[in-house]
UniProtKB/Swiss-Prot annotation:
First-listed, main subcellular location of the protein, grouped into a coarse class: secreted
Keyword presence, Disulfide bond: yes
Domain SCP: 47-195
Protein's organism: Solenopsis richteri (Black imported fire ant)
Locations listed in the record: Secreted
Disulfide links within the chain: C4-C19, C9-C103, C30-C96, C176-C193
Entry keywords, A to Z: Allergen, Disulfide bond, Secreted
Name the UniProt record assigns to this protein: Venom allergen 3
Family of this protein: Belongs to the CRISP family.
GO CC terms in record: extracellular region
Keyword hit for Disulfide bond: yes
Location of the region described as Disordered in the Swiss-Prot/TrEMBL record: 58-77
Length: 211
């Protein structure tokens, strides 16, 4: 893929991460970096954690929410690891900038993103599972009336958007990147996960509720 020519980025006048950052080496913001990327076991752990959480919701076992428990889903297929999404996520993680990148789409589909960072004055012991749970636990602020149509209120997206991307039924693929680095004497652990097809489509159904 020529990422610099991707129409889905151009439509938004956005530069693709792989076009903007051509070097696979961590960028100038990444001081004393380590733990770039994942072992195969860690990749499996990320996928398995996501699928465990998807199945928790799909089977009606998530009791939290502002308006009562989360209803079960007709279907919420398991996610599988996607190397292309992972390469793009890692390239962005390697910039050590805690924000969303401008464009991370692929030829196949639009791509969504969750990011998390933890800081520690000593050794950073936060696990990948801990960070995924930071996203998922937004379910406590999620109103189950939003399932049939994702709200277009940006404020809502800010508070529950990580959770909704995790349980978005039409998302099939995940690929993540990670780096640890130092920033102002803090030991940072930065995780970027890219999801395709992207979730959090305004007005779209998050998942079909099982009656």
């Amino acid at each position: 893929t020529n990422y610099c020519n991707l129409q889905s980025c151009k439509r938004n006048n956005a530069i693709h991460t792989m076009c903007q950052y051509t070097s696979p080496t961590p960028g100038p913001m990444c001081l004393e970096y380590s733990n770039v990327g994942f072992t195969d076991a860690e990749k499996d752990a990320i996928v398995n954690k996501h699928n465990e959480l998807r199945q928790r919701v799909a089977s009606g076992k998530e009791m939290r929410g502002t308006n009562g428990p989360q209803p079960p889903a007709v279907k919420m297929p398991n996610l599988t690891w996607d190397p292309e999404l992972a390469t793009i996520a890692q390239r962005w993680a390697n910039q050590c900038t805690f924000e969303h990148d401008a464009c991370r789409n692929v030829e196949r589909f639009a791509v969504g993103q969750n990011i998390a960072a933890t800081s520690s004055s000593g050794k950073n012991k936060s696990t990948l599972s801990d960070m995924i749970l930071l996203w998922y636990n937004e379910v406590k602020d999620f109103d189950n009336r939003w399932i049939s149509s994702f709200p277009s209120d940006g404020n809502i997206l800010m508070h529950v958007g990580h959770y909704t991307q995790i349980v978005w039924a039409k998302t099939k693929k995940i690929g993540c990147g990670r780096i640890m680095f130092k920033e102002d004497n803090w030991n940072k652990h930065y995780l970027v996960c890219n999801y395709g097809p992207a979730g959090n489509v305004l007005g779209a159904q998050i998942y079909e509720i099982k009656k």
